[in-house]
């Protein structure tokens, strides 16, 4: 489960139209959500509050093994009206899950606001600070968008200096002769006071570059990511048609074949150098991601390929090669596997993981948001009720029409399959009529329908090559978000359970 500060940052990126996934550091984000998920290490309680759409506070308490806490404050230039209580927040947005991100878009500038002949729209920014107790460590983040495609980050960590106490020598203690009197005493090395990290991101949609600098170790880094087959959002339909006639179809525009995958490629790399440590590093990566099908689907269209992501990473200095494969095998199950090997020492590691969405959908539990109370069947608007019934009927008809083209099962089997698809945590694909009916529904009911289509729990499991087994359960229980995890060593006979943790978050 992601922290409240990361949740605010993601919503801020979505509000300003910044590509969250178009970074080299996010190349393996899909597989990492299933193979590298974090387990609660102890009993953690977190309370978050949103007094205004631009100001947020968070209080965290770590009870075990020792009492620690923190206080956080966040403010943004963009009002984040979609962030509310834990009951109204979409559960899929507060956890790390399998997700195939859409193709990146070129960030657009803010809408111009003029007053007295001057532009007053201001600049997008986010300010975050966190005070750790009782250590009094202070960390913070400041990000702002300099241009529509250029964004700057400044992160810092400040540690208080510990007072140096001198212990007097008792009078009865004889003087020590292990050191000459004229030899100066060597003071203990003082801890590092802190660090400042500066990052500059340049995102054009097709290309993204990230330039970083760390003050503590003098490390300079460069990360790049390039998306193949990207032509931008500004290309009109006429230009696309002329380009296809002139160049022909690209590989990712070919018609799908049975059993094939239709997707896009992304390639990138990173280079970093530390002046103080005199170290140098380099790595390269490649990612293939399937492209979601364009709706509505033709009646004779083949079965769309399942959401799939493949990644390949290579570090030539240490000879480490890693490949990962993740896919959604069913509406409620996603699996991932990763194999890493060192080409110099032939040491290898294999990890297998997955997630399973469990629990009933919120609509089946009869839950509603705080802004709109639950209505009885007799008091509901008959027009809205008719639209919802027509929407469900249209979804069934669209799925049955697509199933008849790819299967020879009888009508009963198709009806059962179509009915099961309606209870998936992922919204079902609809045709043009279903889209028109969905647009006719009042915007007031749209957020409630999105919440009703999701499930309220997910179970994750991971098995590593060293026989470390991790199990994580994340769910929404009333107004709280609960995360419980356990880490076990399958080879340990005396102490197979390594750690158990519980985290509870409450948004108000």
From Swiss-Prot:
Recorded topology in the membrane: Multi-pass membrane protein
UniProt GO BP: establishment of mitochondrion localization; mitochondrial genome maintenance; mitochondrial outer membrane translocase complex assembly; mitochondrion-endoplasmic reticulum membrane tethering; phospholipid transport; protein insertion into mitochondrial outer membrane
Comment field on protein domains: Lacks alpha-helical transmembrane segments, suggesting that it resides in the membrane via beta-sheet conformations similar to those predicted for other outer membrane proteins and porin.
Native organism: Cryptococcus neoformans var. neoformans serotype D (strain B-3501A)
Subunit-structure text: Component of the ER-mitochondria encounter structure (ERMES) or MDM complex, composed of MMM1, MDM10, MDM12 and MDM34. Associates with the mitochondrial outer membrane sorting assembly machinery SAM(core) complex.
Family named by the database record: Belongs to the MDM10 family.
Domain of life (superkingdom): Eukaryota
Main location: mitochondrion
Name of the featured protein: Mitochondrial distribution and morphology protein 10
Region Disordered, residue ranges: 160-195
Keywords on record: Membrane, Mitochondrion, Mitochondrion outer membrane, Transmembrane, Transmembrane beta strand
GO cellular component: ERMES complex; SAM complex
Subcellular location: Mitochondrion outer membrane
InterPro entries per the UniProt record, alphabetical: Mdm10
Function as written in the Swiss-Prot or TrEMBL entry: Component of the ERMES/MDM complex, which serves as a molecular tether to connect the endoplasmic reticulum and mitochondria. Components of this complex are involved in the control of mitochondrial shape and protein biogenesis and may function in phospholipid exchange. MDM10 is involved in the late assembly steps of the general translocase of the mitochondrial outer membrane (TOM complex). Functions in the TOM40-specific route of the assembly of outer membrane beta-barrel proteins, including the association of TOM40 with the receptor TOM22 and small TOM proteins.
């Amino acid at each position: 489960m992601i922290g409240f500060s990361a949740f605010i940052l993601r919503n801020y990126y979505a509000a300003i139209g910044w590509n969250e996934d178009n970074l080299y550091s996010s190349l393996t984000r899909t597989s990492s959500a299933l193979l590298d998920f974090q387990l609660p290490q102890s009993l953690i309680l977190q309370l978050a509050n949103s007094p205004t759409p631009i100001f947020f506070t968070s209080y965290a308490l770590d009870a075990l093994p020792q009492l620690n806490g923190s206080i956080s404050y966040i403010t943004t230039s963009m009002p984040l009206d979609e962030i509310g209580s834990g009951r109204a927040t979409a559960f899929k947005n507060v956890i790390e899950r399998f997700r195939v991100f859409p193709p990146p878009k070129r960030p657009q500038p803010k809408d111009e606001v003029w007053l007295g002949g001057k532009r007053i729209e201001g600049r997008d920014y986010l300010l975050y600070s966190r005070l750790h107790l009782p250590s009094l460590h202070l960390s913070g983040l400041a990000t702002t968008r300099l241009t529509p495609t250029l964004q700057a980050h400044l992160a810092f960590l400040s540690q208080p200096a510990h007072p140096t106490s001198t212990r007097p020598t008792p009078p009865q203690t004889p003087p020590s002769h292990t050191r000459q009197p004229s030899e100066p005493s060597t003071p203990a090395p003082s801890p590092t006071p802190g660090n400042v990290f500066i990052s500059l991101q340049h995102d054009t949609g097709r290309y993204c570059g990230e330039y970083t600098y760390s003050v503590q170790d003098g490390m300079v880094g460069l990360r790049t990511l390039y998306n193949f087959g990207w032509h931008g959002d500004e290309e009109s339909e006429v230009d696309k048609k002329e380009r296809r006639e002139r160049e022909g179809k690209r590989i990712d525009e070919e018609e799908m074949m049975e059993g094939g995958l239709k997707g896009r490629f992304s390639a990138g790399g990173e280079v970093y150098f530390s002046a103080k440590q005199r170290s140098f590093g380099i790595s390269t990566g490649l990612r293939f991601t399937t492209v979601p099908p364009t709706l509505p689907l033709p009646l004779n269209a083949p079965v769309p390929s399942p959401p799939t992501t493949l990644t390949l990473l290579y570090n030539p200095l240490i000879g480490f090669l890693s490949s990962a494969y993740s896919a959604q095998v069913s509406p409620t199950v996603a699996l991932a596997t990763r194999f890493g090997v060192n080409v110099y020492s032939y040491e290898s590691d294999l990890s297998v993981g997955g997630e399973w969405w469990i629990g009933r959908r919120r609509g089946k539990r009869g839950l509603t948001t705080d802004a709109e109370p639950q209505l009885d069947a007799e008091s509901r608007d008959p027009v809205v009720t008719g639209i919802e019934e027509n929407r469900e009927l249209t979804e069934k008809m669209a799925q049955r029409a697509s199933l008849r083209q790819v299967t020879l099962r009888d009508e009963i089997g198709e009806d059962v399959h179509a009915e099961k698809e309606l209870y998936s945590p992922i919204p079902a694909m609809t045709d043009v009529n279903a889209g028109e009916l969905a647009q006719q529904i009042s915007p007031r009911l749209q957020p409630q329908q999105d919440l009703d289509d999701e499930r309220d729990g997910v179970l994750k499991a991971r098995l590593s090559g060293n026989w470390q087994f991790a199990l994580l359960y994340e769910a929404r229980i009333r107004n709280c978000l609960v995360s419980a995890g356990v880490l076990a060593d399958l080879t340990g006979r005396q102490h197979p359970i390594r750690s158990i943790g519980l985290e509870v978050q409450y948004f108000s």
